[in-house]
Amino acid sequence: MSTVNASMTVIGAGSYGTALAITLARNGHEVVLWGHDPKHIATLQHDRCNVAFLPDVPFPDSLHLESDLATALAASRNILVVVPSHVFGQVLHQIKPLMRADARIVWATKGLEAETGRLLQDVAREVLGDDIPLAVISGPTFAKELAAGLPTAISLASTDQTFSDDLQHLLHCGKSFRVYSNPDFIGVQLGGAVKNVIAIGAGMSDGIGFGANARTALITRGLTEMSRLGEALGADPATFMGMAGLGDLVLTCTDNQSRNRRFGMMLGQGMDVMGAQEKIGQVVEGYRNTKEVRELAHRFGVEMPITEEIYQVLYCGKNAREAALTLLGRSRKEERSSS
């Protein structure tokens, strides 16, 4: 690819990274999309669409494919990272020596650092230093609908007001894509991780056959767990009533486009964890997020019974129905209690 002066370089050519790149290009911006597999990038360039995940959405002319990381990063100061959470830190280490001096980083990754449960902002600061502007986007966004130009809304939080304003300008499209700024950097990140866990639980409930009442109760109590953990970390509880909290939670718990929900449904129907992951065929973020969110909750002394039971199913071999009955058998509580 010849040198491009791009408004954004997108790191990660999976379904969501591709959808965001398409959205940016459709907004009239020059965009570079980089993926780690040169063969995959060559296929995208040849087909001018992502046949595997978004087969009916052609790439705009202003979307440029690139397999050379240095070339991709030289094209723009604005870098949008869209990779699974368990490789987030690894990717930042990879791009750090190749970034422009004026680089700014935004990510659409939803999750926490593998094993440690740290927020991704802490990973980014450790790898990239304290001076680089950071931002995160999160909210109810299925890649297929976003790429198709169907109405979508997200939350955006940043450490830098100028960067936040620039990102709103780049992403916001009045016809289909609304971007709401939010000063709560912690809350916007955390919502995307916890909702993955609760979505697995909602899927389990439906897989068992518990019905709409149970699913709705689980979503509601899951939101309580999300808010409880968020407050302990210093987030604004109001954030969890917005796009990055309730919005993403409802979407992921109720629609079968969600891998986490489908994964949970298979577990509820009796499939083992490995078999369910293989059948999904893509990364199920909630599997790792469950372990990470549980670790974070223990570290801050926050009780999260739904998360705990999902962890028991995923990592300790507990039966999904047994886990559900454990939750139902808990002692009576006040609705607004801290446990």
From Swiss-Prot:
> Which residues act catalytically here?
K195 (proton acceptor)
Q: Which reaction does it catalyse?
A: sn-glycerol 3-phosphate + NAD(+) = dihydroxyacetone phosphate + NADH + H(+); sn-glycerol 3-phosphate + NADP(+) = dihydroxyacetone phosphate + NADPH + H(+)
Q: Which biological process, per GO, is one annotated for this protein?
A: glycerol-3-phosphate biosynthetic process
Q: Which residues bind sn-glycerol 3-phosphate?
A: K110, G139, T141, K195, D248, S258, R259, N260
Listed GO molecular functions?
glycerol-3-phosphate dehydrogenase [NAD(P)+] activity; NAD binding
Q: Could you confirm whether the keyword NADP appears in this record?
A: yes
Q: In which pathway does it act?
A: Membrane lipid metabolism; glycerophospholipid metabolism
Where is this protein chiefly located? cytoplasm
Top EC class for this record: oxidoreductase
Q: Does the keyword rRNA-binding apply?
A: no
Q: Which UniProt keywords apply?
A: Cytoplasm, Lipid biosynthesis, Lipid metabolism, NAD, NADP, Nucleotide-binding, Oxidoreductase, Phospholipid biosynthesis, Phospholipid metabolism
What is the E.C. number? 1.1.1.94
Q: HAMAP family, alphabetically?
A: NAD_Glyc3P_dehydrog
PANTHER family per the record? GLYCEROL-3-PHOSPHATE DEHYDROGENASE, GLYCEROL-3-PHOSPHATE DEHYDROGENASE [NAD(+)] 2, CHLOROPLASTIC
Q: What is this protein's name?
A: Glycerol-3-phosphate dehydrogenase [NAD(P)+]
Upper classification of the source organism reads: Bacteria, Pseudomonadati, Pseudomonadota, Gammaproteobacteria, Enterobacterales
Q: Which gene encodes it?
A: gpsA
